[in-house]
């Protein structure tokens, strides 16, 4: 990224601050320059590597989106790692921010994500229940099979760990006044969603901020979410669950990047001074 302001190096998913990165904030635990160097190394290594943005880059990109609805959409991609066809159907009731019994804010809010297949299965089950008359034996069998598939493919809960994002969700729910079952982004085409991201990238470019990852797509934010977790040493099994990967190999694709940097992190060396080696080997 060409002219990304150095002072925007924060680790929070979506909060940009103006603190000096050498003294405070995320710079204490997020080495931006090393992260960029590692990403460049991965890009040079080959094409079979994730194409991802870093937290400071996403923060700058989000800051260029004045439309709150569009910003919240990109924010949701980044904070959940959801696939585009999982994000677009999200409703207010999919976000569990408060205790259903007391109404108190949850300390660990989350969003319920459903794949396209899961939504189709649930819709098929609802359609059968709405059917009139006594179901035939074949219809009963089909319903049992659908319910079994739903049990075997449950939706996943993704924790919302960024307080700033949760607060923006709350504010949007109040501002938009949406019913619980209404979609947050009632758009017909996935191309519209992609164009919102392109508009944000173009706005950043007008301010002299460019990104080395081109084009920036919904998949970019999914990969960025996964890499953000890897960078913070979240266990691979947890990442697999949050990403909705059935196969662990899909998650290993992200951890492979850090294999390029493991020897530096661990201080592994293979050379040894011959004199010191001789002292160890020769009898005293």
What role is predicted for each listed range?
Residues 89-171, 259:
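Conserved tyrosine-mediated DNA breakage-rejoining catalytic core shared by Y-recombinases
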Residues 55-84:
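Basic, Lys/Arg- and aromatic-enriched nucleic-acid-binding interface segment
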Residues 50, 65-66, 76, 210, ...:
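Residue-level marker of regulatory loop/turn positions in helix-turn-helix DNA-binding domains and
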Residues 1-38, 45, 49, 129-141, ...:
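C-terminal secondary-structure termini that scaffold catalytic or DNA-interacting sites
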Residues 190-194, 211-232:
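Short basic/aromatic active-site micro-motif
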Residues 133, 137-144, 154-212:
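Active-site/catalytic core of tyrosine-dependent DNA strand-transfer enzymes
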Residues 105, 243, 247-268:
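Catalytic-site neighborhood detector that most strongly recognizes the C-terminal catalytic loop/helix
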Residues 75, 220-246:
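C-terminal catalytic core of tyrosine-transesterase DNA break-rejoin enzymes
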């Amino acid at each position: 990224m060409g002219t990304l302001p150095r002072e925007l190096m924060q680790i929070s998913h979506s909060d940009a601050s103006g603190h000096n990165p050498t003294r405070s904030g995320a710079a204490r635990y997020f080495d931006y320059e090393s992260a960029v160097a590692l990403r460049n190394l991965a890009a040079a290594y080959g094409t079979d590597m994730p194409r991802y943005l870093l937290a400071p880059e996403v923060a700058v990109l989000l800051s260029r989106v004045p439309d709150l609805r569009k910003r919240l959409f990109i924010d949701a991609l980044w904070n959940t790692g959801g696939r585009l066809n999982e994000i677009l159907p999200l409703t207010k009731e999919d976000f569990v921010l408060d205790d259903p019994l007391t109404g108190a804010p949850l300390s660990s809010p989350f969003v319920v994500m459903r794949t396209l297949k899961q939504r189709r299965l649930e819709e098929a089950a609802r359609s059968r229940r709405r059917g009139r008359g006594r179901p035939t034996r074949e219809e009963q069998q089909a319903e049992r099979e659908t319910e079994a598939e739903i049990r075997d493919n449950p939706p996943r809960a993704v924790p919302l760990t960024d307080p700033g994002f949760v607060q923006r969700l709350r504010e949007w729910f109040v501002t938009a006044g949406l019913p619980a079952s209404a979609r947050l982004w009632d758009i017909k085409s996935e191309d519209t969603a992609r164009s919102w991201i392109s508009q944000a990238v173009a706005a950043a470019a007008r301010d002299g901020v460019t990104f080395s990852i081109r084009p920036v797509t919904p998949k970019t934010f999914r990969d960025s979410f996964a890499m953000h977790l890897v960078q913070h040493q979240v266990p691979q099994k947890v990442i697999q669950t949050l990403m909705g990967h059935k196969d662990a190999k899909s998650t290993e694709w992200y951890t492979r990047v850090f294999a390029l940097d493991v020897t530096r992190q661990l201080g592994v060396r293979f050379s040894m001074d011959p004199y010191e080696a001789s002292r160890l080997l020769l009898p005293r």
